[in-house]
Amino acid sequence: MDKETQMMLVPQGSIEGYIRAANEYPMLTAEEEKELAERLYYHEDLDAAKKLILSHLRFVIHVARGYSGYGLPQADLIQEGNIGLMKAVKRFNPEVGVRLVSFAVHWIKAEIHEYVLRNWRIVKVATTKAQRKLFFNLRKTKQRLGWFNENEVDMVANELGVSKEDVIEMESRMSGADVGFDLPTDDAETETYSPALYLEDKSSNFAAELENENFESQATEQLGAALQSLDARSQDIIKARWLDDNKATLHDLAAKYNVSAERIRQLETNALKKLKSAVNF
């Protein structure tokens, strides 16, 4: 992978600058995309893979915005989505008859969703116990029931001890319908735009409401004690990445400690594992 692609897969500096740079890569026509996909699929052409990836970065950004309400760093959401995009490009079969973005959106969302599930508890220790219970139980409940009707909303609310409004809000957040992400055809009679071009977070106020909740004393004490058990550098990384209002990027901390961004990620991952094993909520 060349330096340009590596830099665009890991947002650095201001997120606004990254988005501007991503939007400068032109979108592909169906014919251009098919040609590049065939070169990659049949001949393992890495230059074709690069062009496919860079031309779809803007779609990752739009999908990542749909998860902004959880308070996680936008740069990290985008980076996780980019991992999903790379996996999709690698597996894309140009003979299937769909556009790459329709195939890739599922991989992009899967990577971001798993990232949210891995990290949301530590970030949102201030939320109510009922909200945490809902977040981590709703997915398995939905696997059993599918999309909820009114009676099922009542049942889930009673089962998890939360309000019906919370169930509906969380279901909307976690299970938004996947609509077509293809670009309009050239012969479209009216000027329309792909949902991927205007997809945005429809319920970002959800996290803002949660942030106004009072800390539960037990969870706060547990987290405080767990943080104190970490070494000074790990404490600083967790606070800077997850607890401060102005969250630092991996590259910010890499520069501070004169190590690579990957090393900071490793330290962060190890620290989060220790916190999760120490905090019971």
Curated annotation (Swiss-Prot):
Gene3D superfamilies, per the entry: 1.20.120.1810, 1.20.140.160
Q: What SUPFAM superfamilies does the annotation carry? A: Sigma2 domain of RNA polymerase sigma factors (SSF88946), Sigma3 and sigma4 domains of RNA polymerase sigma factors (SSF88659)
Note the DNA-binding span(s) on this chain: 250-269
Ranges where the record places region Sigma-70 factor domain-4:
226-277
Molecular function GO terms recorded: DNA binding; sigma factor activity
Q: Which UniProt keywords are present, listed alphabetically?
A: Cytoplasm, DNA-binding, Sigma factor, Stress response, Transcription, Transcription regulation
Q: Motif Interaction with polymerase core subunit RpoC: residue span?
A: 76-79
PANTHER family noted in UniProt: RNA POLYMERASE SIGMA FACTOR RPOH, SIGMA FACTOR RPOH HEAT SHOCK RELATED
Q: What does this protein do?
A: Sigma factors are initiation factors that promote the attachment of RNA polymerase to specific initiation sites and are then released. This sigma factor is involved in regulation of expression of heat shock genes.
Protein name (record)? RNA polymerase sigma factor RpoH
